[in-house]
């Protein structure tokens, strides 16, 4: 079983009875963020969730730390001010910002709307940006087998170990 702990939370591939963890179930690691389901209990305050998940609004109304994986364009109805971090690829981000193609401009516009948001933008150049109100980091791919789904898993595993954003970005991109 694979697990990474952050306070009382974990990403686990197998459900354990009576666990005090956030359980994310999926058949294998590479597909973890494609179609995952989140199981939440009252002791876990960190949630990793797709923006089309039917339980998202409930998590946004709680005191959870929400990591939001953007999988479709319909977010205008969501209050992103309650989201800690969003993961979005350039195609989706461009559509959110009226077709703008410049990655740095997309990041700037998202942060203008939501100043406390942390954004991880996966580019079509085989790399990724991290941006928050204090810094911006770009990490280009150093190897030639960039996989966007594996990027998400590796980034989150690093973040849950309380590594810096720079370290998490590097580990996500360089699989």
Language-model region placement:
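Ribokinase/PfkB-type carbohydrate-kinase core domain
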Residues: 2-138, 160-171
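Short glycine/threonine-rich catalytic loop with a Thr-x-Gly-x-Asp
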Residues: 138-159, 172
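Short arginine-rich
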Residues: 175
